Amino acid sequence: MIQILLSTFISFIIIIVSSNDIRSGENDNFNNNKMINNFLTTITTNDTIIIKETESPNDYDFSKEQIESLDKIVYFSSTMGIVGALFIIVSFFLFKAARTFATKMIFFLSLSDLFAAIFYLPYYRDSDIMCNLQGMGLVFFLSSSYLWTMCISISLFMVFFTTIFELNHWFKYFHFICWGIPLFTAIISLIFHAYGKTGSWCFISDPTSIFRLLYYLPLIVVFFINLVVFIAIRWKISQHSNSLVSRVNIIVSFYLIAFSLSQLPTIINSIQNFSDPDNPQFSLFAFQLLLQPLQGFLNCVVYGINEGFINHYVEFFEKYIFRCRCRKSRELKEIESDKTSLLVDYENSDDEEGFDGMDKLIIDDYNRV
């Protein structure tokens, strides 16, 4: 299912971008003349020619210095997001025992976070083709990311409030939602030439267009779904009072905090852009670039740094990295322990029996490694 969606996605990109190139080639002369007329306005007065430079309609919303500041922010947040997402992805492939229903969803969430952070990097704005590619990549993978968080919330709700615990058959519906809806939004926005420069990156350029709503309205809906689900779960587990329930309560709170931190600045910025499109706020764009690409790292902290993954990594390092060191260390500890017991029980046992027991401990230790 995933391979079919991704191949369809790539095919549409190639076809549509190619058709755009053909149309742009036919209109080169017209566009060049229009650009020259917009760029230069000549006014002749008393044999004096005054040349006035006008702004290009494709200019960014901020100054060059502000764009450079936004680039520095996104380099930091995207790098952290990539590292966090890769941690979960590598852990998923490394430990077969950890591939449960929950970790599979977290894996696909991290996959979306990884590519979203990559597409946020400012390497795609030098040409129309690259700008369209960045816009499509961000729409597709950011939408997929927040839809996967919704699926995780739905799964938690089913576990806490119903008797349905076997959810593997739901995966086909989750894949359809989390890949199909973003694919439709990304392609329809490309067909109608909705992508352009906004802030310091390429996205759906018109903040009041229907295509922006196709992206942000589902995000707002998902935000409130997650909020309601997590409040309901906290209420449910608050009916019980023990250390395990308190721990679950803290974890659920972290889920909501991580999602809110990564998505709330984006929602606020989109509302401001929609209500006042001619007055973009640099601080809101900066907060969006700081936190939204960081989602892979935040999800790593919430979902990846858990007892299961940590135990798997401890076993992995003991088995493959520190095998010799750990084995020798354990041997020395056993020898010291046996020496102590031999000194204490020397009068009640002979040397041969003592050393036989020590050898047996070392052999057993080798068998456990």
Swiss-Prot record:
Transmembrane spans: 5-22, 73-93, 101-121, 147-167, 174-194, 213-233, 248-268
Topological domain spans for side Cytoplasmic: 23-72, 122-146, 195-212, 269-369
InterPro entries the UniProt entry points to: GCR1-cAMP_receptor, GPCR_2-like_7TM, GPCR_GCR1_put
Gene disruption phenotype: Cells grow to a higher cell density than wild-type cells. They also produce large aggregates with delayed anterior tip formation indicating a role in the development of the anterior prestalk cell region.
An annotated GO cellular component: plasma membrane
Protein topology in the membrane: Multi-pass membrane protein
One family name in Pfam for this protein: Dicty_CAR
GO molecular function terms noted in the UniProt entry: cAMP receptor activity; G protein-coupled receptor activity
Cellular localization per UniProt: Membrane
Transmembrane as UniProt keyword: yes
UniProt keyword list: G-protein coupled receptor, Membrane, Receptor, Transducer, Transmembrane, Transmembrane helix
Extracellular side: 1-4, 94-100, 168-173, 234-247
Record GO biological process: adenylate cyclase-activating G protein-coupled receptor signaling pathway; negative regulation of cell growth; signal transduction; sporulation resulting in formation of a cellular spore
UniProt function note: Receptor for cAMP which may play a role in prestalk cell differentiation. May act as a negative regulator of cell growth.
Family per record: Belongs to the G-protein coupled receptor 5 family.
PANTHER family, per the entry: CYCLIC AMP RECEPTOR-LIKE PROTEIN A, G PROTEIN-COUPLED RECEPTOR 157-RELATED
Identification of the protein by name: Cyclic AMP receptor-like protein A
Organism: Dictyostelium discoideum
